[in-house]
Amino acid sequence: MSNDNKDLFSVLNHAQSRIDRKENTQYTSAHSEIVVPAVPLSSPHHHKEDSTYNASSIRILEGLEPVRLRPGMYIGGTDSKALHHLFSEIIDNAMDEAVAGYADLIDITLDSNNYLTVTDNGRGIPIENHPQIPDKSTLEVIMTHLHSGGKFDGKAYQTSGGLHGVGISVVNALSDDMEVEVARERKLYRQRFSRGIPQSGLEELGDVYNRRGTRVCFHPDSQIFGENTAFDPEKIYKIARSKAYLFNGVKIRWNCDPAALKDAKNIPEKDVFYFPDGLKDYLSLSLKNKHLVTAEIFSGKTQQLSGHGSVEWAIAWHNGDAYIQSYCNTIPTEEGGTHETGLRQTLLRGLKAYAELIGNKRASIITSDDVMASTVVMLSVFIKDPQFVGQTKDRLATTEAQRIVENAIRDPFDHWLANSPHEATKLLNWVIERAEERLKRRQDREINRKTAVRKLRLPGKLADCSQNSAAGAELFIVEGDSAGGSAKQARNRTNQAILPLRGKILNVASAAREKMSSSQTIADLILALGCGTRSKYREEDLRYERIIIMTDADVDGAHIASLLITFFFQEIPDLIRAGHLYLAVPPLYRISQGGKVAYARDDSHKDELLKTEFTGKGKIEIGRFKGLGEMRAEQLKETTMNPKKRTLLRVSIDTFEMQETKETVQNLMGTKPEERFRFIQESSTFANNLDI
């Protein structure tokens, strides 16, 4: 099964593009983040005699060829998130120089032609011939060889996030034009590359006396990311600003061509990021005008002994949504890791110790989940040789990081509580209230899940699964009884439930609350989920691990998916934050030739399959599915519901773009058609194909 992440902004924009343009245009958009799987939805079936397997079938990939062939293995895909990951790789190298104490200035320049330049005043990439490959400069080795760099032996860098040979070489492979300048030992050098291949030798440009460091200028390859792909100035700006918060010893200067800012809101052409109080400055700005449980933000920074690294944190408790933004060596760890585990355990133990000190026995019931409820956390660690899960470094796996964080925060947290007894008691009572609410909810729930089902009187159209546990359970939301019938036959009855919807769900972005409350379709959906809405959402009451929107692969299906996503975003956003909401990817076409069958999700995929898979003799038959209900149960199972073969797109929310996402949802789904039309004109490449 393939699970690709898609932020909610991209999902809605992509779906709206399908609705508001002519149906025969292809799936391409500047903001669309549909990830094309490496294989068709259903791989073509061949007769055994059609295939050969011998020595000539084995291919050895050389140099950076694996990166171009499977970019998803290195940057997580070819969508907008992956595109901006290229910038992260380059600025991470510059930040490593700053953290190591060799640089204090980074310049970032975004041109209107989609060239991005990052310059630092560090030591500069070495340029002398490499001892292991004597006929090449070290710069060329770093740029063209995976797993080469100065961060493996721990001598050049005590802590680092990027690895020159993994990060910058991958960016080089995925750029159609890249130029690297190195100012080192009073000499200026330059080398050019294209798609990972040197286009020139190492050139010595002359003497420089007032400059040192590395300048990297690159242009993403349209063959990888698409013709209309462009950097988002707002995303680049926010990434750069966050790096400055993470290390208060660096100044980052931002420059952007005005032509590149035409669609960006409130992003200046020039800016300077420098924050002497680091994460505390960041959190104070984020929580401006918010009511906090304690008057002060708990923040600090600890340098560990024996060169093991450092920890910086800023923590506040408030009455809003909880989120944790953590980093390791300036790398954002979106999926958490061992450093977050250390933080959670330390805060729990500290509060329990304080409760014992003041004789509050009620605190015995609190857990780390109670402590972290409605907590806003910024956590940054710098450690030697960090171990991450996956190439994109979304989760920290270093075991020692937990101990480092615990040792760093334990004493400061104890002192913070002891020095402000009034605030500490207020916080403790607040956490105890969260724990008591949790226990009351548990007592109110029926022990047996099936009893709870009967008690709730779940919708009659719901075909529930047989297992009692939510772990591994899936709810498919489908449109209409016809599709529901096929899905019920195709499902695994043990863990897959089907909920057919009657017609299009209400657009909650434009409907009054009274109308939403009277909608039977919405009431059925809320009952089936079992987790409540808005502030009453309870993760532990959610009856399924995955909520999968499965609609037709046409315009109407996209519209229904947009309405459902809007409902989840406005009414149950925590369900999206927890990673429970997915989009199924059903096929639009069935292609057959002789004994070979394949399924295509859209027109461009169909054309690709016709060129690559159906090149033999014989009549090619192409059938277009009008809807899921037209598919046989075995076809639906094979292409869309079988975990081993299907593709799912996970919907996500970027915490730091929450306000922008709210505005986008309102513009696309709200009551003002002129705002929707304006948004499409400004943000979509399909404006010329509008069919209104």
Curated annotation (Swiss-Prot):
Binding site for Mg(2+) 1: 479, 552
Gene3D superfamilies in the record: 3.30.230.10, 3.40.50.670, Histidine kinase-like ATPase, C-terminal domain
Catalysed reaction equations from the record: ATP-dependent breakage, passage and rejoining of double-stranded DNA
Effect of substituting residue 214 to I: In coumermycin A1 mutant
UniProt key word tRNA-binding: no
CDD domains, per database record: HATPase_GyrB-like (cd16928), TopoII_Trans_DNA_gyrase (cd00822)
Effect ascribed to mutating residue 214 to A: In coumermycin A1 mutant
HAMAP family: ParE_type1 (MF_00938)
The protein's name: DNA topoisomerase 4 subunit B
Organism of provenance: Bartonella bacilliformis (strain ATCC 35685 / KC583 / Herrer 020/F12,63)
